[in-house]
Amino acid sequence: SVSDSVQVSQAPDSMSVSASTPALEVLRSGLLTTFQDDGRVAANMGVTGSGAADRTSSHLANALVGNPANTPVLEITGGGVRMRAIGSVVVAVTGASADVTITGSRQSQDSQGGSNGTFTPNSPGGCSGRTVLNASNDAADRTTIAMQQPVLLRDGDVLSIAPPTSGLRDYVAVRGGFGVATTLGSAATDTMSGIGPRPIAAKQRLAIRTASTACDAGVGLPQPWPTDLPKPGRPTDLYVRLGPRDDWFTAAGLSAFLTQTWTVTAQSNRVGLRLSGAAPVERTDTRELASEATPSGAIEVPTSGQPVIFLRDQPVTGGYPVIAVLEPESLDVAGQLPPGACVRFHVVSAHATSTPQPAYPTKEVR
């Protein structure tokens, strides 16, 4: 395995949880929940970068609770997660659009902070003012909260994240960060090689580090959605730069790649998205290709002619020609594509030019 070849020493997944350590106790772990950050730099050891599939959303979650951007977060694929707060915890949920609720004695807690819907710092105890922004009570002990905002969970509160209505992955950041060990400089779980912490399971207690400053310092305000989330029934536009092996394909093959709508198949995960289309991408060069480096966002075309988009857990090398590479912002969007989603590719032109361009959709980079 990769971990054997580089002799990686796996540290314990997280710091121990004492009675006085704030934590999140996992009641339901969902389809796949992992620790992620910005990933590791270890390609020279044959190890992929890994990290958050939607880095924009993970950075936003950390910003909302006042953490550095690279602080480990929880990446939740497909929702269905429930976690109980042990002690007071400031959290933020970003990413895929989903119903997020808090169950606990919220009405009496909210009354301490007034009724103007604002987060009140510097109240007695440091963070004991208004606990929820833009919340609505739909039951005596259940509160529905808007995403993309800091929220205070009190001891015993249960945070629930439902399956997404658009997008695929949600991110949970906690003020101070999770007390998770790093491997090769990162706390990211690499699902292909097994490097990093194991996927989160029910009954785990996830320790939370103490924030270095007062809990209200640097906590952000509610933010708009950072990316255009994939929506059912509407094709998602992904922007690419052609190459380095686009010359291995026929003109008809390039046209098929760029003009038809592709569907994300169920054989997709954090490693990559397998696509299906009516017209396969035809190759003009049928030789075997020596293994080459494959970055996240590379789009390989195997002999079937059905493209594969590599995501964050991609292999460091691949043996099929790469027809194009996603732009960084499109890589984050691709990380939110669920099975069944439809995508279209658009070529990015680096500069405006009078030279005739291919008759494909383009986006000019300024």
For each feature predicted by the language model, list its residue ranges.
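Conserved "landmark" site that anchors the functional core of diverse proteins
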Residues: S1-R366
